[in-house]
């Protein structure tokens, strides 16, 4: 009798737990994806804060030249970062228990892997949680599809790119100036500015900003007047009201006359789908571009494309960019290379075997 009651009681506890996890009445929805998302994001956040503030220098290039990234080692908010794990570790999984000591784990940049792996798992679960909540509420599932763009970007720079380059030391540092350094080195090694997928991403981000500003300003300029001049116009809207709060016909008429008729949407659903799809598709392409450049399928190379009748090179902007790329490449990881491969791979210059006679 006791055993039966105990089993029934434990079953009731599990059922109550399942009901609470999947309840849409909670102030913040947890969901089954949230069961994994919450601890992973908490672990990533706590480790990031501790490492950003107090982590010792990391031997990022694997040449016994540690690079300091934390605040207590002299950095500020802009220059500080969680430094990527050492090139000596490469692509090896490097949890705490794989190191001989905690000092070794810190010296080889173990916190970077801990933060990145937990962060990516947590972000993937956040996407799943968006789908799960949409499903519970009977909504369409496109919110998580839109979120897949920044998730794909994070996965590209933190996981796919290091895999393609053969080491997590090539991943993006977790800091402001570290992000800029990653971008500069990426341009130097892969010529990303000349990659069509990056161009589509630029069009997506800048175009999305433009369309967002256009939409917001048009809506704000065509609000239906519900208040007096001494009241805020925001009081003219009541949450959940059935009436339109702005006049889409007026907005359509204005923009159609400003540009031309068919440049303006006359269907609100088409308009908002476009506003979501444009930046998402652009960022998808950029993430795909980074993922292909990870395996050295780089941007277009138009260096020395124009030659005159005498065989002399006529420089174009492509050659200017190439010279900048070479300059950036020889400056990064300055002590890790005997000679940059891109410079060493050029044509061999003739060398005189005998010194010319100098009549003096």
UniProtKB/Swiss-Prot annotation:
Per UniProt, where does chlorophyll a ChlzD1 bind? 118
Record's InterPro entries? D1/D2, Photo_II_D1/D2_sf, Photo_RC_L/M, Photo_RC_L/M_CS, PSII_D1
Where does it reside?
A: Cellular thylakoid membrane
Any one cellular-component term (Gene Ontology): photosystem II
Q: Please give the positions of the paired cysteines in each disulfide bond.
A: none
Q: Which domain of life is it from?
A: Bacteria
Which NCBIfam families is this protein grouped with? psbA
Q: Where is the site labelled Tyrosine radical intermediate?
A: 161
Binding of [CaMn4O5] cluster: at which residues? 170, 189, 332-333, 342, 344
Q: How does it sit in the membrane?
A: Multi-pass membrane protein
Residue ranges annotated as transmembrane are 29-46, 118-133, 142-156, 197-218, 274-288
Full protein name: Photosystem II protein D1 3
Task: Offer an example of a GO molecular function term for this protein.
Answer: oxygen evolving activity
- Pfam families, alphabetically? Photo_RC
Residues bound to chlorophyll a PD1 are 198
Q: Which residues bind a quinone?
A: 215, 264-265
Q: Which UniProt keywords apply?
A: Calcium, Chlorophyll, Chromophore, Electron transport, Herbicide resistance, Iron, Magnesium, Manganese, Membrane, Metal-binding, Oxidoreductase, Photosynthesis, Photosystem II, Thylakoid, Transmembrane, Transmembrane helix, Transport
Q: How is the cofactor bound?
A: The D1/D2 heterodimer binds P680, chlorophylls that are the primary electron donor of PSII, and subsequent electron acceptors. It shares a non-heme iron and each subunit binds pheophytin, quinone, additional chlorophylls, carotenoids and lipids. D1 provides most of the ligands for the Mn4-Ca-O5 cluster of the oxygen-evolving complex (OEC). There is also a Cl(-1) ion associated with D1 and D2, which is required for oxygen evolution. The PSII complex binds additional chlorophylls, carotenoids and specific lipids.
- Name the job this protein performs: Photosystem II (PSII) is a light-driven water:plastoquinone oxidoreductase that uses light energy to abstract electrons from H(2)O, generating O(2) and a proton gradient subsequently used for ATP formation. It consists of a core antenna complex that captures photons, and an electron transfer chain that converts photonic excitation into a charge separation. The D1/D2 (PsbA/PsbD) reaction center heterodimer binds P680, the primary electron donor of PSII as well as several subsequent electron acceptors.
Binding site residues for Fe cation: 215, 272
Q: How is it modified after translation?
A: Tyr-161 forms a radical intermediate that is referred to as redox-active TyrZ, YZ or Y-Z.
């Amino acid at each position: 009798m006791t055993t039966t009651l105990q089993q029934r009681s434990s079953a009731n506890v599990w059922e109550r737990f399942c009901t609470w996890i999947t309840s849409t009445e909670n102030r913040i929805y947890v969901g089954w994806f949230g069961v994994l998302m919450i601890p992973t994001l908490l672990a990533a956040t706590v480790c990031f804060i501790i490492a950003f503030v107090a982590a010792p220098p990391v031997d990022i290039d694997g040449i016994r030249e540690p690079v300091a990234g934390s605040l207590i080692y002299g950095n500020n908010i802009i220059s500080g970062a969680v430094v990527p794990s050492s090139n000596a570790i490469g692509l090896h999984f490097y949890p705490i228990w794989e190191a001989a000591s905690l000092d070794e784990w810190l010296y080889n940049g173990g916190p970077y892997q801990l933060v990145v792996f937990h962060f990516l798992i947590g972000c993937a679960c956040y996407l799943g949680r968006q789908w799960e909540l949409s499903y519970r509420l009977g909504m369409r599932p496109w919110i998580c599809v839109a979120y897949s763009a920044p998730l794909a970007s994070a996965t590209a720079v933190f996981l796919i790119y290091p895999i393609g380059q053969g080491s997590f030391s090539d991943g993006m540092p977790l800091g402001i100036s570290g992000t800029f350094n990653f971008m500069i080195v990426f341009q130097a090694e892969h010529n990303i500015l000349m990659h069509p997928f990056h161009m589509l991403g630029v069009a997506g981000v800048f175009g999305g900003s433009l369309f967002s500003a256009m939409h917001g300003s048009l809506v704000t300029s065509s609000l239906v007047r519900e208040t007096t001049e001494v009241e805020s116009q925001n009081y003219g809207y009541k949450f959940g009201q059935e009436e339109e709060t702005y006049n889409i016909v007026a907005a359509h008429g204005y923009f159609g006359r400003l540009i031309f008729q068919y440049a303006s949407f006359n269907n609100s659903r088409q308009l908002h789908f476009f506003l979501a799809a444009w930046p998402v598709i652009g960022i998808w392409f950029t993430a795909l571009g980074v993922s292909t450049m990870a395996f050295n399928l780089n941007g277009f190379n138009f260096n020395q494309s124009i030659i005159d009748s005498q065989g002399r090179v006529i420089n174009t902007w492509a050659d200017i960019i190439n010279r900048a790329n070479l300059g950036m490449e020889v400056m990064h990881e300055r002590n890790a290379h005997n000679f940059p491969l891109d410079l060493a791979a050029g044509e061999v210059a003739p060398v005189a075997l005998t010194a010319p006679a100098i009549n003096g």
